[in-house]
């Protein structure tokens, strides 16, 4: 089962129910809607398709709105584009009403003149063309520049000024309209472009609260040096983070991007906040059916770094192979997770310097350690807000984390968290009911089977957010009976119900479990072949108890109506330490 989540961008290449269904079946968990392109009508049509696919497939699918953000672009160019050569002089004007040419281009942000300095650099089209600022014409408010390289400058291309604090607004009027539209139509996540400071996130959160949609999770995209410098304060007010390597690689030296990625991921992991690694992960698959070896390595390293999700942009939105791109990313994620399984101890140690003092986080770490020690494959976390599941996920357990939640909105918000399988359940009224519901739902969804040992995490008083304080080890399945155990061992075998010594001696074979009302010396031929005994007669000095200790086999005595409750020939597990008899095979006792 894949634990790393996949964010898949929708676009012209994935614009029908059949393709979106294939993307979901290939492993996409969250669908990204890029509001830098398209209109509300187009996006709503795709959102409706995602919800239809969710109902059709039964898979939990999230919807993420990616804002256009406050960005600087060139205006249109005369003739659409032109070529500039190394050493050419060109001016950059702040007049956004005019078209550009090889002598002068115009940009959409008038403050660029004030924010930049002589000797600085202006990059066009993700760095395809670099301009060095030679002088500033104060009278005309134009930057006098020299081309660093030969290249093409086109219409409406992105403009960056590396290392410069740009005083653009956190969210634009378009962003506000787009976010309100998304909130109205049930989005689950907002990916906020060009976030530079905490206030940018708070402005978006205010829009969510205004729409009574505080459940929508906000993931700022860190794309500039200013955002990197302010990362700690940004994370404090955010629900997660996107490492957006595209503009980041233009705004800061590209050689620093891998190390910034690792730092940002580690900070998110330590706080238990999900992080997405994005941009050009399988970029060549826009045109080719297979990724390059470098791309495979890039995705794998992001997973090893600790990313919660890996993202596809143009690969699934505009490329020739959208489904194959998701499938390739799925396969890389799953293969890499096998390596993570062997590194769990490192995951448990890596947050020593970040340890908090709250109970939920302490229990999260304890749960993962316990699961690792006992070989538990499923952790069931009852969570009202999703916090408990995230605090367990941060330690990257080998076990699957089943998040039992009672709100569909919280369920969808957990769909992007590493290793978490969010399941909607009816809200129980007390802790005992919760344990029963947790076992039932996990079994119903195929996460566990009878006999599995699971860890259930919850809070008392039940149902209140932030009260996680309870961890319980529980065996899934039917406990048939209870008695007094003799010894400390456990055994699995076929039940042989015998009402007399003669019947027992005739029916019991090597390794069977003898079930009888009582025993005496006449039962010894059968007892010597048995791997365990269940007896209705009680007492630690009874024949069965004494013989069991002598032979070193598990025995449970004082089991009322054992010969009538237990079916002859059925498979049983006898746990002498607990004095319990279970239907079927139970491991990890």
Swiss-Prot record:
Substrate binds at residues 32, 246-247, 279. It holds the Pfam family PK. Pathway: Carbohydrate degradation; glycolysis; pyruvate from D-glyceraldehyde 3-phosphate: step 5/5. It is an enzyme of class 2 (transferase). It comes from the Bacteria. Mg(2+) binds at residues 223, 247. It catalyses: pyruvate + ATP = phosphoenolpyruvate + ADP + H(+). K(+) binds at residues 34, 36, 66-67. Keywords: Allosteric enzyme, ATP-binding, Glycolysis, Kinase, Magnesium, Metal-binding, Nucleotide-binding, Potassium, Pyruvate, Transferase. ATP binds at residues 34-37, 73, 157. One of its GO terms (molecular function) is kinase activity. The record marks 221 as: Transition state stabilizer. Its EC number is 2.7.1.40. Its cofactor is Mg(2+); K(+). Coiled coil: none annotated. InterPro entries: PEP-util_enz_mobile_dom, Pyr_Knase, Pyrv/PenolPyrv_kinase-like_dom, Pyrv_kinase-like_dom_sf, Pyrv_Knase-like_insert_dom_sf, Pyrv_Knase_brl, Pyrv_Knase_C, Pyrv_Knase_C_sf. Strongly activated by glucose-6-phosphate, ribose-5-phosphate and fructose-6-phosphate. Weak activator AMP and weak inhibitor fructose-1,6-bisphosphate can act as strong inhibitors in the presence of strong activators. Homotetramer. Belongs to the pyruvate kinase family. This is Pyruvate kinase. It comes from Lactobacillus delbrueckii subsp. bulgaricus.
């Amino acid at each position: 089962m894949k634990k790393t989540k996949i964010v898949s961008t929708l676009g012209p290449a994935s614009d029908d129910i059949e393709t979106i269904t294939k993307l979901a079946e290939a492993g996409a968990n969250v669908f990204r809607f890029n509001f830098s392109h398209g209109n509300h009508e187009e996006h709503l049509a795709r959102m409706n398709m995602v919800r239809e696919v969710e109902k059709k497939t039964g898979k939990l699918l999230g919807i993420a709105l990616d804002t256009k953000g406050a960005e600087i672009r060139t205006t249109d160019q005369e003739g659409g584009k032109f070529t500039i050569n190394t050493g050419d002089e060109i001016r950059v004007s702040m007049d956004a009403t005019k078209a550009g040419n090889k002598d002068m281009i115009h940009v959409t942000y008038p403050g660029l003149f004030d924010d930049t300095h002589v000797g600085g650099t202006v990059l066009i089209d993700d760095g395809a063309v670099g301009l060095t600022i030679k002088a500033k014409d104060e009278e005309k408010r134009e930057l006098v520049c020299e081309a660093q390289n030969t290249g093409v400058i086109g219409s409406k291309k992105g403009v960056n000024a590396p290392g410069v604090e740009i005083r653009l607004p956190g969210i634009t009027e378009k962003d506000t309209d787009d976010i309100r539209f998304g909130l109205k139509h049930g989005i689950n996540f907002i990916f906020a472009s060009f976030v530079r400071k905490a206030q940018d996130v708070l402005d978006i959160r205010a829009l969510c609260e205004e729409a009574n949609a505080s459940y929508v999770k906000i993931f700022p995209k860190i794309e500039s040096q200013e955002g990197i410098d302010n990362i700690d304060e940004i994370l404090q007010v955010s629900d997660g983070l996107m490492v957006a390597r595209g503009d980041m690689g233009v705004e800061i030296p590209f050689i620093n991007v891998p190390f910034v990625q690792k730092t940002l991921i580690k900070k998110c992991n330590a706080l238990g906040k999900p992080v997405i690694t994005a941009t050009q992960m399988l970029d060549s698959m826009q045109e080719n059916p297979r990724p390059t070896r470098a791309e495979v390595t890039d995705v794998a390293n992001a997973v090893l770094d600790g990313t919660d999700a890996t993202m596809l942009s143009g690969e699934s939105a505009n490329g020739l192979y959208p489904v194959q791109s998701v499938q390739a990313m799925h396969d890389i994620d799953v293969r890499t997770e096998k390596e993570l399984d062997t590194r769990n101890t490192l995951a448990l140690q890596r947050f020593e310097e970040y340890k908090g003092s709250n109970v939920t986080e302490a229990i999260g770490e304890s749960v993962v350690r316990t699961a690792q020690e006992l070989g538990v494959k499923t952790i069931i976390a009852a969570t009202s807000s999703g916090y408990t599941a995230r605090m367990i996920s941060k330690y990257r357990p080998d076990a699957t984390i089943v998040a039992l939640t009672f709100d569909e909105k919280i369920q969808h918000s957990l769909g992007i968290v590493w290793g978490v399988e969010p399941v909607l359940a009816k809200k129980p009224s007390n802790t005992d009911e919760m344990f029963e519901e947790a076992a039932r739902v996990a079994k119903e969804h195929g996460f566990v089977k009878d006999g599995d040992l699971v860890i259930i995490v919850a809070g008392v008083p039940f149902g209140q957010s932030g009260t996680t304080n309870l961890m319980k080890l529980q065996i899934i399945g039917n406990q048939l009976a209870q008695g007094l155990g003799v010894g400390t061992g456990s055994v699995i075998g076929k039940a042989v119900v015998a009402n007399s010594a003669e019947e027992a001696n005739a029916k019991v074979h090597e390794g069977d479990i003898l079930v009888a009302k009582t025993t005496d010396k006449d039962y010894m031929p059968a007892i010597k072949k048995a791997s365990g005994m269940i007896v209705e007669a009680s007492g630690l000095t009874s024949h069965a108890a004494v013989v069991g200790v002598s032979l070193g086999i598990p025995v449970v005595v004082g089991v009322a109506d054992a010969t009538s409750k237990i079916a002859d020939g059925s498979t049983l597990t006898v746990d002498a330490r607990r004095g319990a008899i279970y239907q079927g095979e139970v491991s990890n006792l």
